[in-house]
């Protein structure tokens, strides 16, 4: 249902209008906020940063890990992730082609060596899984899973209920602005935005995203949407649809190499997220912090994404603060009617949902 609404919004150019009306300073801020957000995700995935009841979050405690007997299951993976960040950073600094991919492979290989030598001891109970490919099912290990149990298994029994409407609208809101935020961030990093902040040929990208959402639902998968990891492809020079098509072909081939890809651990992919975050944050240099009515909303957008753990919340904070700050400082000419409407919608969401 959400995907169908997306298609309608894309065909009627509503999504494009929302994208175009967001000020360029906020588009730059979205790129920075996404960078901090995915870097935080990477640090959490690697357990370099962990939850803490006293301070909310904290760095991993190696001493506690050693004394608690978890160093060889969790502590060593944190060490490997830190090494992976260094390796990936060096690769990028030396302008090595495919540096992020080589960083993942190098960290994975180090993990395999640690498991083989006994330095890393897998324990699924604490989320420490084996990093060795599992071929126990023989040739069946290389065959894609049977989609028939979930393919076209749609349930329309609750369509007329209020709860269903609330869920659809909630998903629509989050996915709508997450996708726009990702497009803003990646396009900004790729220097594809025009001087007025608009993006050429955005309608095709939005339609592809909408159709992907519908196709994913029919296949029974989680939402197929635009991912911020696309920035890693942009950093390697990807700019056209050929990049996306090539990626799709490789994804298809990966279905038949599942044992290898499923063995790649979180501590090997986390450094990639951290470094992609760095690439995204570089857009902060393009924000004019001397222009406070533009800079303050950009700042609110940036800090909201990692702290609220949501791209859409960052956009919400940015737009609402932009409307308020510019209206109350006499810069109403910068605020279009659509921005006022969006600000009201965001505020209503916080009150009603």
Question: How should each PLM-predicted stretch be described?
Answer:
Residues 17-27, 36-90, 117-156:
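Inter-helical loop and helix-membrane interface segments of multi-pass membrane transporters/permeases
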Residues 25, 29, 74-80, 99-101, ...:
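Loop-to-transmembrane alpha-helix initiation sites
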Residues 71-75, 153-163, 198-199, 288-292, ...:
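Helix-boundary and loop/linker segments of multi-pass membrane transporters
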Residues 90-101, 235-241, 282-293, 308-312, ...:
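Membrane-helix interface "capping/anchor" motifs
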Residues 5, 22, 26, 71-75, ...:
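Hydrophobic alpha-helical transmembrane segments of multi-pass membrane proteins
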Residues 1-34, 185-284:
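Helix-loop-helix junctions within the multi-pass membrane cores of secondary transporters/permeases
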Residues 60-66, 104, 108-203, 344-348:
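Helix-loop-helix hairpins and the membrane-proximal interhelical loops
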Residues 2-10, 32-47, 78-93, 103-116, ...:
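Hydrophobic core segments of alpha-helical transmembrane domains in multi-pass membrane transport
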């Amino acid at each position: 249902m959400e995907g169908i609404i997306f298609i309608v919004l894309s065909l009627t150019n509503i999504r494009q209008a929302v994208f175009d009306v967001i000020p360029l300073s906020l588009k730059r801020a979205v790129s920075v906020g996404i960078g901090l957000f995915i870097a935080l995700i990477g640090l959490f995935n690697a357990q370099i940063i962990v939850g803490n009841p006293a301070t909310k979050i904290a760095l991993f405690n190696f001493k506690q890990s050693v004394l608690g007997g978890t160093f060889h299951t969790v502590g060593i993976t944190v060490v490997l992730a830190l090494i992976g960040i260094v390796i990936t950073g060096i690769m990028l600094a030396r302008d090595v082609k495919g540096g992020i991919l080589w960083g993942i492979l190098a960290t994975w290989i180090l993990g395999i060596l640690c498991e083989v030598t006994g330095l890393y001891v897998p324990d699924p109970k604490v989320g420490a899984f084996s990093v060795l490919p599992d071929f126990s099912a023989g040739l069946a290990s290389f065959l894609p899973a049977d989609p028939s149990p979930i393919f076209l298994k749609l349930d329309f029994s609750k369509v007329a209920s209020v709860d269903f409407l609330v869920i659809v609208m909630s998903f629509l809101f989050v996915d709508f602005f997450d996708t726009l935020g990702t497009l803003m961030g990646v396009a900004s990093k790729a220097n594809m935005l025009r001087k007025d902040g608009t993006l050429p040929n955005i309608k095709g990208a939005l339609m592809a995203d909408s159709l992907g959402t519908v196709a994913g639902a029919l296949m029974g998968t989680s939402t197929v949407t635009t991912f911020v990891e696309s920035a890693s492809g942009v950093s390697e020079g990807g700019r056209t649809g050929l990049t996306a098509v090539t990626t799709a072909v490789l994804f298809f081939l990966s279905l038949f190499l599942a044992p290898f890809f499923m063995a790649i651990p979180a501590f090997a992919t986390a450094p990639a997220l951290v470094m992609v975050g760095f690439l995204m944050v570089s857009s902060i240099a393009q924000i004019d912090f001397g222009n406070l009515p533009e800079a303050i909303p950009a700042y609110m957008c940036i800090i909201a994404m990692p702290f609220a753990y949501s791209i859409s919340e960052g956009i919400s904070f940015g737009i609402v603060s932009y409307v308020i700050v510019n209206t109350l400082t006499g810069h109403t000419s910068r605020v279009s009617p659509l921005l006022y409407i969006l600000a009201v919608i965001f505020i209503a969401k916080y009150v009603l949902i």
